[in-house]
Amino acid sequence: MKTRLLVAVVACCVALSSGVRAETIMAGTAAGLDEDSIALQGQRVRLWGIDAPSVDQTCKRGGKNWTCGRDAARALSGLVTGKTVRCLVIVEDKLRRLIVGDCTLGGESLSRWMIRNGWAVMNPRQTDAYAKEEAEAKEAKRGVWASEFEMPWDWRIRQRMKGKAP
């Protein structure tokens, strides 16, 4: 009896220390919230691996200001709202938004779709998995790549320095 208990305790300790964690899957009817976040099961879910222009960010297209951030948000919302989305949760970030590795709609990655259509850029601090799609969007001048734009992370830093936290 003591041997079985000891084996069970050791097995649990090994399993807990192995770094393996259970995958958390969220699924349900989604709604677009902003340029890189959706609402799913009453929670805010941020798409993993991308950074899109903030809703207040503008780009220059044809010498004129263009609300590229607002259009990125509209594109994501139009894609997901009212549809069933499935997300694999990776980690909860310091802003208490869920970051997910693979949010899909009909088997297609939402992050990959946003990048392929030029509505977001790859977040190099998270992944380089979308490099091919980003290069193709840039070459085809899709979305923000058809304009002059500041990388979203640089734009946010500049806004903070001006005292306008996005």
Identify the role of each PLM range.
Residues 2, 6, 13-166:
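Small beta-barrel nucleic-acid-binding modules, primarily SNase/OB-fold domains
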